[in-house]
């Protein structure tokens, strides 16, 4: 496995691979790998002759007061994990090589970024889109793999790809979970033992809402209230950021669940901000 630390190194190698007729799969990450990341890599390995993993804690997607400095890092371990999944290259740039001091160009998908996580993180998806577009261009990826846990992110990236006619296919992998249902996240390390014990109730309440919807409950308000009641009882350490029901592609809020519908949430527990989602109807 090759290790690249500059955009120029990555671009040169990927051009050479394409010239040799090799297609390229990209798995963009911020590191501190868990089984969810490993699933993305394993899937990416099946999609193309060459697998590129990017490991970059992107400062542009962190807002003021967020956990950029504290975000967990273990580059040596992550490099070994990427190699174990057959990555041909790992891209580990310094922020200064990705963003000049006077960087002024941003990519946005405002309609899809406005709600859900965008409500409390207004510049987050601008940073995500900008760095992902950079990675697409540098790697010349034919396919890129993202996770369903970050549903809004993958929906925004799919729209960016469509709107800009980018020659890359997006694949979304199901969320990987702990045995008790908690979605895997690098930020789970922030949880105290008490918070960790309650955190699976996020998923349990979403499953309850899915069951109600599939039994015929159609009011988004009533479904939301059912989740909030369970959380009030079983998730007392949680502080709600948002809980909403939207169309899975447009991310427009829904009043009635009569077709495709996604319930998505963010809950703060201590230092951690946990996100999850569930398709009520697909």
UniProtKB/Swiss-Prot annotation:
It is found in: Cytoplasm. (R)-pantoate binds at residues 61, 153. Its EC number is 6.3.2.1. It holds the Pfam family Pantoate_ligase. ATP binds at residues 30-37, 147-150, 176, 184-187. The keyword Nucleotide-binding applies. The active site is at 37 (proton donor). The reaction proceeds by a bi uni uni bi ping pong mechanism. Catalyzes the condensation of pantoate with beta-alanine in an ATP-dependent reaction via a pantoyl-adenylate intermediate. This is Pantothenate synthetase. It comes from Desulfovibrio desulfuricans (strain ATCC 27774 / DSM 6949 / MB).
